[in-house]
Structure formats: C-alpha cells, structure tokens
From Swiss-Prot:
SUPFAM superfamilies: ARM repeat. Sequence-specific RNA-binding protein that regulates translation and mRNA stability by binding the 3'-UTR of target mRNAs. Binds the APUM-binding elements (APBEs) in the 3'-UTR mRNA sequence of CLV1, PNH, WUS and FAS2. Residues 610-950 form the PUM-HD domain. The keyword Amino-acid biosynthesis does not apply. The lineage of its organism: Eukaryota, Viridiplantae, Streptophyta, Embryophyta, Tracheophyta. It is found in: Cytoplasm. InterPro entries: ARM-like, ARM-type_fold, NABP, PUM-HD, Pumilio_RNA-bd, Pumilio_RNA-bd_rpt. Residues 1-25, 138-171, 204-240, 260-303, 360-382 are annotated as: Disordered. GO terms for cellular component: cytoplasm. The gene is APUM1. CDD domains: Pumilio. The modification Phosphoserine is found at S194. This is Pumilio homolog 1.
Amino acid sequence: MIPELGRRPMHRGNEDSSFGDDYEKEIGVLLGEQQRRQVEADELERELNLFRSGSAPPTVDGSVSAAGGLFSGGGGAPFLEFGGVNKGNGFGGDDEEFRKDPAYLSYYYANMKLNPRLPPPLMSREDLRVAQRLKGSNNVLGGVGDRRKVNDNRSLFSMPPGFEGEKTGASASEWDANGLIGLPGLGLGGKQKSFADIFQADMGHGHPVAQQPSRPASRNTFDENVDSNNNLSPSASQGIGAPSPYSYAAVLGSSLSRNGTPDPQAIARVPSPCLTPIGSGRMSSNDKRNTSNQSPFNGVTSGLNESSDLVNALSGLNLSCSVGLDDRSQAEQDVEKVRNYMFGLQGGHNEVNQHEFPNKSDQAHKATGSLRNSQLRGPHGSAYNGGVGLANPYQQLDSPNYCLNNYALNPAVASMMANQLGNNNFAPMYDNVSALGFSGMDSRHHGRGFVSSGQNLSESRNLGRFSNRMMGGGAGLQSHMVDPMYNQYADSLDLLNDPSMDRNFMGGSSYMDMLELQRAYLGAQKSQYGVPYKSGSPNSHSYYGSPTFGSNMSYPGSPLAHHGMPNSLMSPYSPMRRDEVNMRFPSATRNYSGGLMGSWHMDASFDEGFGSSMLEEFKSNKTRGFELSEIAGHVVEFSSDQYGSRFIQQKLETATTDEKNMVYEEIMPQALVLMTDVFGNYVIQKFFEHGLPPQRRELAEKLFDHVLPLSLQMYGCRVIQKAIEVVDLDQKIKMVKELDGHVMRCVRDQNGNHVVQKCIECVPEENIEFIISTFFGHVVTLSTHPYGCRVIQRVLEHCHDPDTQSKVMEEILSTVSMLAQDQYGNYVVQHVLEHGKPDERTVIIKELAGKIVQMSQQKFASNVVEKCLTFGGPEERELLVNEMLGTTDENEPLQAMMKDQFANYVVQKVLETCDDQQRELILTRIKVHLTALKKYTYGKHVVARIEKLVAAGERRMALQSLTQPQMA
C-alpha cells in the first residue's frame, strides 16, 4: 500500500529522527484503503454514465474532454488534469477540483457563449490575474508553494517534482492562488514522507458540522489578522530541538472571488525555511461540509477552514531529527512553558497566544494515542459544541482518558484530528461576561451549559471531567496541570491579546459583543425581578454566590485568590457550595485557592435584587394589620419602598415613644441615604415633624456640612425645607449660613430655589441679610427667570425692611412695561399690584395708561391689566374704562378688544369689577354691536357674559320690585 501513496526513498539525516516504521505503515495502509475505496466509487459512477441517454444534457466529463481537446490540439496530453478518467495525476474527475483550475477559467470565459451549460468556474478573473502575476516568480526561493516549471504547459496547480500520486497544498483556489507569501520553494530532495505528511494529506475526514462559516469579502480584509495570529515570535520559537525541523501552521482564508461559491481550502504554511509538506492541500467534499463556524459569537475565526486548535497544535509541532536532543526533564519543561506563557506578553504582542507542544519525541506517541479517540463524539455535540473542547494551554495533557461526559481531559489533538472548528462555549474564562448568569442554573449545571440547548458551557476548561480510568491507565497527570484557575487566567490573556482586537477587527461578534450581552442580560434580569439592586445588604452564605444565580455580575480580578477572598473555593462567595467541592474536583486540586467561574464582588450577595420576606409579606398580605414594632430590623428597607414608606409615615403620626426610638435607631445610620431616596425622604420629613425633640436635633445635625448638596438634590431639598420649618432657630441659622456664597446658584436651580424661598419665609430677616443683599442690582434679571421670579415674590411678601423694599421696588417700577409683557416678569408685577402699597399700584397703573388696548391684546400683559381693574381704586378703574371705550361713537377700541383672544377677558373683567353706572354705560355701547359679536369666536364669550349679567340684573330688579310693595 505504501507505494500507492506516491512515496519515494529519502536520505535520512538522522535515523532516530523519524517515527517508527510500524506507525508509518499502519497509517499508510489506512489511508491507502480509503483512497482505494474512493477510486472504486469513481469507477462505478463512470460506468453508470455509459448508460446515459443521448438526449441528456452534457456532463462535466464531456466538457473536460472538450476542453482538453481544444487546448492540446486533440491529444489532451498536456492537460491531463481535465481528463476525468486519469486518476493518477489529474483531478480524479472531481467537478469542484476541475472548476477551480485557472486554465478552466480561461476556457469557460472563452466558450461560455458556445456552451451555456458549462459549469461556472470557482475562480474569478481577479483570482486568475493574481495567480498569473505570481506565476512568473515561482522560481524564487520563498515563493508560493513549489511552483517551478516542470512542465510549461501544465496548470498552475502542478505537483512537486517526483510526486505523481498526490497533489500538493497548492491546489487551493483562494489563499494559494492569491499569492500566500511565506511558503518556501525548497525542493523535496530525497526526504521520505513522515507521519505528519501522511496525516495532513488525509486531514479532511472529520465529523461533519452543520453550520457554514461566514466569510469575509476578500483575503485582504482578513490577512492582517490571520498572519499576525500565525507568526511565531522569537520567544515562542525557543527550545525547538532540531536545527531545521518541520513546523506546521494552518493558514486559512477566503477567496478574492465576488461570488460565494468557492469553499475555503486549507493549505500548509511553513513560516520558516524548511521542506514543503506533502499532501496537505487535498480536501474532499466531506471536508467542505466540515468547515463550519461553531462560534456563537461569529468571531474573527469565522472564515477559517480548520480549527484554532489545529493552528495552535501544529504551529509548534517539532518532528525532530534526534530523540535525545532535549535531555531536560518533563517538570523543567512544564515550568518553562508556564513561565513563557504567563509572561510572554513582554516579548511580543502575540506571544501569549502561541500554545507550544513539548519538544520531545514521545509527543508523537501521545498524539497517536489521542488519534484513536479522535472520532469519538461527546453527548452534546452540535453547532454550539463540536464534540470536543478548546485546547488546554497545557498541551502535554493529551490523555486518551475519557470521563463521565465522554470528553477527553485535554482534547486538543482529538479536536485537531476531527477537524472541528474550535469551541463556541461561553467559557468562564470571560471574566467580564455574564453569559453564565442565565437564570435557572446553579453550580451543578456549570458543566452542562445552556439548560435549553444542553450545550457544555465550561467544556473548554475541563472542569470535573476526570475519568475513573485516570489512576489506572493513560498518561500520567500532574495535579498542577489541571488547576482550573490557571486555565481561566491564561485563556483570558489569550483572548485579550488577540491581535485582531488590536486592529479593531471585531467582526460583529468579538469580546466587545460579549460586553453587550452582559448589559442586555443585566437589563433583562432587572426587569424580570422588578426589584432595584441594593447595596450593603447582608450576605446569605447559604445561597450560591454564583453569576448563574443572577444576583450580580462578575468582573475581572485576580483568579488566584486567597481562601479569605471571594474567589476561593472554600469562600462563602464561591460559585459552589462547600459540599460540591469534593464532587466537582479530585483530591489533587481541592486545596487550590481561586474561584472557578470568574472573579466575584467582595460585597456581592444573593439578597441584592430581591426584597426581604418581611417586605414581601407586608405587600402581599392586605388583610393583616402591621405595627411599627413588627418591622424592627427592616425600617430602612421599608423606607425605601413605596408602600413601606407610606406605612411608616402613617404610623409615625400616632407612634409610641418606644416605636419612635426604634425607628430613630434604624434610620440614623442611613439618614443621608434616605434623604436622597425617592421614598425614604418622606420618612425623614415625617420624623422631623413627629420625632421627639432630642431626636429632631440629632437628626438635624446630620444635615450640617451637607446643606448645599442636599439643597440641589431633588429629594434632599424637601428634607432641608422641612428641617428649616421645624428645627430650632439656632440650627436654622447654622444651616442657612452654609448657603452663603452659593445663593445665586441655588436661586437658579430648580431644587435650590425652593430652599431659598423657605429660608426667606422661616428665618428672621436679620439672619438672611446675606441672601437679600445678593439680589440687589439683579432684581429685574431674577424677575424674568423661571425660578428667580418666585424668590423675588417671597422677598416682596416677607421682607419688610424699608431699605430692602425701596431698593427692590425701584428696580421693578423702572421696567414695569417690560416686566408686564414677560412670561415670568408679569407675575412679579401682579404680585406688586396685589400685595403692594397703594402708591405702588398707582405708579404701575399710570405707567400702563395710554397702552391699555395694546397691553390687553398681549398674552401676559392682559393678566396685569386684569389685576389693575381688580385691585385699582375707583379713579384708576374709571381711567382704564374710558380708555377702552374710546372717544367716538363707534367705540373702535372696545370692538377690537371684544374680538381679540386675550383682550375679551379684559372686557369681561371690566363688566365684573366696575360700578353700576359704568356697567350701564358699557352695556349700552356693546348692545349696538351685539349682533356682529356673535359672528366672532371670542366675541361670543362677551355676549354670553352680557346675557348672564342682564339676566342677573333682571332678577335683581324683580326682587326689588317685590320687596318695595311689602315695605309700603
């Protein structure tokens, strides 16, 4: 069977460097048998084609023959690849392989009009141009593949010299055709195929995966991230034994073609000058179905053909030429690998991401042992979990042992053999991601993933999956190799140092999207329970302190914690109960500190987000009558609740001394917090009213040094106002002094202005002189301010000092007309007319006289005119009425006012406030225009008022006529 693989003898540089002949023969026989069955199936299909009807449409084989005849002049010898029957050196009748060839692309575009049924090529013209440009430089060392001109008439996808039985990895239609730089063009010489070569030639026979990967638009969009991910830094290459070893890294990509037809192909990339691997580019149709993106986040690896496990595993695989070159012990290498992995970030931006295989020849035997289990599937393999977990940073744990869940302890090689695309589990290594926080899961489900889909969320961390065969067979395991906290920390570094994140290549589904998932989940969680999260709640250590219980979110922190820290396995904040530690971990790891599911808040508690049983009972039990003494220990919690706050307020009005003392003792430590609470501030206000005098004083002392910030706060300003009303004078004065220097700021604030008003109302004038003096020179400005106008009105009401009154009124009276028309200033003028001195009202009315009609038609000034009619004297009122009637019989000013939307109210106010003589005069003038007024919307209002007045006058006259005869 071995000769069928196209193998040739090779000159061995070192007899001890190759794998055993037994392994090679065994693998060769297995692969040869698979190829033989494939050939038999193709032969059977070709025989069946002989019986096709003559009227059937042409087949691809016929097109191949025609293409070969056209290009070779009938013989078709130079284009053996087009011959469907030539299995030895051609494409073997594979339609997709045939359609990928650049020669077929030229043939297709030349003959597509002659034969419309020709299958379209899998390469675009852009791909062909790139390939042709690179074809001219294929004789340069370090070019793309081994593309030396063995036959000038051969296709671009020619084989390496001396190998007629297998195609090389250059048959891919995307990365290799696009000019993937870095594949050395060294000749193969006489080297014999190694185990890795044979293995790579048959890499495609893995389990099918249902989902197709999402592909970037072009290789150029993706190459920067992939190249950076697959370049080994110097420190990552240290310790490789042989001077010129084989080093493999799977480089995967997408096509430049604009159509989505071509499937991604996998080739082997050699990042260092070495021999080109053989047989790594062939992929069967089965393989193409295996290239599925399993990540639910559609990360940057979504366009890759092979798993990230394969990239990491083969990138450091060293097929050394000498078994004894590395004489260091296993423990020394393990220590070095841990040190290089954890601190490799100092040497290069991507060193942390490189997972190396141990540099020992017996690693091949471990890989072979894992290969036997590579076809085993876990019980939950699906689009979310391909049946194998993400490779552990400790690559030496390639044990074939399987545990209760049928997963390998470290399935790195198993994943590689099965050609699965990584792992999309919501692993706990994402410290900032609360993906594990789905409700309905406790710590016993952490190894099972989503409850609904049955996926294994923590499969990649290998938590608790130790077989009962661990002590009896397989590779020996060191306890430190399965420390779950190191796995978590290492993978967090690996994710956060991904160069694709440095380039902002998020792909729509990266680590940043996980943060969005966290926010979305937190919002959904809050809405589900409907209870705001509280801080400072006592912890219940009997509950799970796990993010899966939904009580809080996990945030990044050191995963290597002390037993007294929340991350400790034995900490009360541990994701597991104490009795689960023995169940989940072997004895070798039970004494390790550090949590398993990410860092946890020191003050996190299950009680956060859930109301106490007492409060819930109070709100649910409507029939039972509660007393204040029954909620002892829950006063603060009740105060922060809408119904609990109302209950305390009602009970405080009739509470006994003991009950008041109980409430006082509980609210005092949290007084400042409750003052700014939407419901708690009412409890504080009520306690200021009904608390004992000593308690009120002590509570007022809590306000000192906090008066200004509380005055500017929506709920705190109410507490300050209540305190200014009820506390003793000395405390009032002390509180008010804290506003000195901030008066104007408070006046212009929507909350602070109420505090200033309360100070003017409740504090003696001599103690607030600093407030009043601040207003001098700014009265007009404040009068036109939405909040300042209220403060000026309080000054006019409560400040009786002659000097203060004269200064304020002087500024107001100097701008009466302007203030009367201002949306806020008109209230100040109205306040002066209502509460001012008679001489001040006279000044205002005389200022408005001559502009009454104009002012009456203005929205805000019309209110001022009405106040003039209401509070003015008889002489002042007569002056205004005469101006409204005008000097002619037509009464033009009166007609205009009755038809105006604002002035008609002034006319109605005149009819209400004037004496009988003036009212009779006005009614006589209005009756002349009564019919015309009914045609106007606002005139109807005046007509209705007149009719009411007439009816009232008639009733009054009738009543007088009845009373006069009786008196006679």
